[in-house]
From Swiss-Prot:
The keyword Cytoplasm does not apply. The keyword 4Fe-4S does not apply. Transmembrane segments: none annotated. GO terms for molecular function: electron transfer activity; FMN binding; oxidoreductase activity, acting on NAD(P)H as acceptor; oxidoreductase activity, acting on NAD(P)H, quinone or similar compound as acceptor. The lineage of its organism: Bacteria, Pseudomonadati, Pseudomonadota, Betaproteobacteria, Rhodocyclales. This is FMN-dependent NADH:quinone oxidoreductase. It comes from Dechloromonas aromatica (strain RCB).
Amino acid sequence: MKILQINASARSAGANSTRLADTVTARLLARNPNAVVELRDLASHPHPVLDEPALGALFTPADQRTAEQSARVALDDALIAQVQSVDAIVLGVPMYNFGVPVQLKTWIDAIARAGVTFHYTEKGPEGLLKGKKVYVALARGGLYRDTPADSQVPYLKSVLGFLGMTDVEFIYAEGLAMGAESASKAFAEAEAQIEELIA
């Protein structure tokens, strides 16, 4: 088994979402001792955003790209290859202003490529990253689960499903900014959820 952990926090150390993702990965390793873990921290190793030069590179045929364009596409290729190679993905996701961190959106923009991780058929789009288990560890200061303010879960369900990753579990630690007692309770409940999911 090969596991990819993505830490999406803007903080490379001390992030609640990373703590939660670490707990998920540790539980997977406990149940799969021979598993291999690859870690990608999006704060300490930021990926370039999808801007006009990047779009130009992606839409230029490979044999016509400049050296600079080829280098830019290669950065995305590396992320795609990494995702293609793993069996399980653990995403550590904090909530920033009701959405996902820009670091995570940039990663998603990099791995979502027509003809590679999804394609269009006569019946519509089909995701090509099938057969992967995804755990999304959500850390939030307030209480947003199952409310209109939670834009993260619908978005992540949609985009991961679009890419073929439909076996997704969401793990919640909420109320982390609402006092020490609330935070302690949130982590305890999240850890119990992890133990139940990865039995």
